[in-house]
Regions:
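N-terminal, polar/charged subdomain of small-to-medium soluble alpha/beta proteins
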Residues: 1-77, 86, 92-125
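Short hydrophobic/aromatic beta-strand micro-patches
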Residues: 82-84
Length: 125
């Protein structure tokens, strides 16, 4: 669907955020993956609310949000956010806003899995 944006001639800028799972060291253990779970209906409803609030706050033409579910290994992408606008400053501000809203409000839960197979629930900061 992103390729279709070429025909939208009022768009002057696109911005993309790719969230990637890091191999964080926590208490002498290294993260090897994060297993994401969600109440999908609730998460989709929250993504919709965030999307609509972002369209109200910023002059955007288009937005796409995709969050992984299941096991995502370190180095792999877990979150994709794409925004389009007539102006570049809008896409920079909007993208930061949307990512922070997702991190703070979306009911998506991450279980950090360590190399030794132990785990802990991730705290978003």
């Amino acid at each position: 669907s992103i390729a279709k944006h070429q025909s939208k001639t009022t768009i002057g800028a696109h911005n993309i955020f790719l969230g990637q799972v890091r191999a964080d060291a926590i208490d002498s253990k290294t993260v090897s993956a994060i297993e994401y779970t969600a109440y999908e209906d609730m998460a989709n409803a929250k993504f919709y609310e965030i999307r609509e609030a972002t369209f109200e706050k910023f002059n955007l033409t288009c937005m796409h949000i995709y969050h992984s579910l299941g096991k995502v290994n370190t180095g792999e992408i877990c979150l994709f956010v794409f925004v389009s606008s007539p102006r570049r400053k809008e896409v920079f501000k909007a993208l930061e806003y949307v990512v922070e809203e997702i991190k703070a409000k979306a009911p998506v839960f991450g279980k950090e899995i360590f190399e030794d197979t132990t785990h802990q629930w991730k705290v978003n900061i």
